[in-house]
Amino acid sequence: MWTPTTRVHYSRRAIRYQSDLTDEEWRVIEPHLPLAKATGRPRAWPLREIINAIFYVMRGGIAWRLLPSDFPPWSTVYRWFAAWRDACLFERINHALIMTDRELAGREASPSAAIIDSQSVKTTEAGGPRGYDAGKKINGRKRHALVDTDGRGLILEPHPANIQDRDGGGPLLQASRRFFPFIERAFADAGYNHERVTTATIVMVEIVRKLPDQIGFAVLPRRWVVERFFAWIGRNRRLAKDFEATVDSARAFLYAASVMLLVRRIARAS
């Protein structure tokens, strides 16, 4: 419920654009960005402006070339994005911020339970890998997400939409063992009830089935948390569809959206 106190707490009117980092948010993310090299040409633009520009593109759903003139040149911003994408920087920042946010919430840094689900979205003429999801009747890509019980995005992976959940779930759980080795249980829907998922790792997969008398939509235990995560990152218009020509860029934007959520949450709690 909104109150005068919460409205002031969440207000972003004092900054240039709604997607810009506040001073508190910059202090959260700055330690995780690469330091300037001791030799060579000095940076022409501060990294804070580069991050602000990337978040602006993601939040507004615009093309790189349409960046306003008060940001660094679009080509400079894109080069930084591509370098960070190839270095998996957003994934590493996301991992570090998840542990920080969990500890601020009074929980263990690494989760012991998670929820897995997928979301199919359309692609555009940009090209790249895609497929047809016969169940959702969508030609595009599928976003697989593994989130903790509070809805933080642990592992995010896009791939062609024709890959079924039972084929995409196993690799996602295997990837989680590297960053979150203490996960013991994963909740999932019936699409993951297959040995390719249940035997992929030592994580026990618990299927949360629909209610016996369920007709239409219903909020199901555990599973709603990952749906809420998709709704959270879906506020970024760049993610309304998959506009990226490569899966690597699509993955980087998914993690960047998760990082934006975590940075704001940690800054408010600090």
Located regions from the model:
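Short alpha-helical elements
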Residues: 1-270
